[in-house]
């Protein structure tokens, strides 16, 4: 065990055999080309599968659509960033000079969380990384109450409203991308041809901008008397 990481290993609940994998998982691209991006890609897939499996087994009466919506909520950026902070990952992130202070940024925390999962998977095996992930997620999963939780994201809700009213789905497109690589601002436009609506919103990622655009369109549809049918 590398002394300076012994505390971090205890927090994670996992001891790396190859600590260079952990270093890579914590290293932002502003520091070096040998950064966490590939591990992030791997960790994203591992996390998605583990969460999908546990939801499938725990909520046996939940339909596929609801399972997908609940999984999306559990693996969204805000959730991952909060988990990363609770595991003190922000204290160990390695940044270049141009990114100093970025260890508290949600997108970086989200990426590092997924990268660490990818690193644990490569350092061990699927059974081990699954056990670690479920330990991290246990408080969240055990507190899920399907009677009170809103699992439907705005794009899914908008889709249901339109389909229930025999209307075509909106088309999303990026209008502009402003700012530096690590501080990009996406402007997304959603167009509903059947309703002759054009809605625009901004976000720090394409996904967030699309969700905000969908929220705006739902509000406009509500004003026209179109609501989701229960």
From Swiss-Prot:
Q: Give GO terms for biological process.
A: mRNA processing; regulation of gene expression; rRNA processing; tRNA processing
Q: Which UniProt keywords apply?
A: Cytoplasm, Endonuclease, Hydrolase, Magnesium, Metal-binding, mRNA processing, Nuclease, RNA-binding, rRNA processing, rRNA-binding, tRNA processing
Tell me where in this chain the RNase III domain is found. 5-125
**Annotated positions binding Mg(2+):** 40, 111, 114
EC assignment: the record states: 3.1.26.3
Every copy of the DRBM domain together lies at 153-223
Localization: Cytoplasm
Q: Does the keyword RNA-binding apply?
A: yes
Obligatory cofactor(s):
Mg(2+)
GO (cellular component) term, any one? cytoplasm
Q: Which PROSITE patterns match?
A: DS_RBD, RNASE_3_1, RNASE_3_2
Q: What role does this protein play? A: Digests double-stranded RNA. Involved in the processing of primary rRNA transcript to yield the immediate precursors to the large and small rRNAs (23S and 16S). Processes some mRNAs, and tRNAs when they are encoded in the rRNA operon. Processes pre-crRNA and tracrRNA of type II CRISPR loci if present in the organism.
- For this entry, the protein name equals Ribonuclease 3
């Amino acid at each position: 065990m590398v002394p300076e990481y012994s505390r971090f290993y205890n927090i994670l609940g996992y001891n790396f055999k190859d600590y260079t994998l952990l270093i890579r998982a914590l290293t932002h691209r502003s520091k070096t080309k040998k950064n966490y991006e590939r591990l992030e890609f791997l960790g994203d897939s591992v996390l998605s599968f583990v969460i999908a499996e546990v939801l499938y087994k725990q909520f046996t009466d939940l339909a596929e659509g609801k399972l997908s919506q609940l999984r999306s909520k559990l693996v969204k950026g805000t959730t991952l960033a909060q988990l990363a902070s609770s595991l003190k990952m922000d204290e160990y992130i390695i940044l270049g000079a141009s990114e100093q202070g970025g260890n508290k940024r949600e997108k970086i925390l989200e990426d590092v969380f997924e990268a660490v999962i990818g690193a644990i998977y490569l350092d061990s095996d699927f059974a081990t990384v699954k056990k670690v992930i479920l330990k991290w997620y246990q408080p969240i999963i055990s507190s899920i109450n399907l009677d009170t939780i809103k699992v439907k994201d705005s794009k899914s809700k908008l889709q249901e409203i339109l389909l229930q009213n025999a209307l075509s789905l909106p088309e999303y497109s990026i209008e502009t991308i402003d700012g530096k690589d690590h501080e990009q601002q996406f402007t997304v436009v959603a167009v509903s041809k059947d309703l002759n609506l054009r809605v625009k919103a901004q976000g720090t990622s394409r996904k967030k901008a699309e969700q905000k655009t969908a929220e705006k369109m739902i509000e406009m549809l509500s004003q026209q008397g179109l609501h989701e049918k229960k």
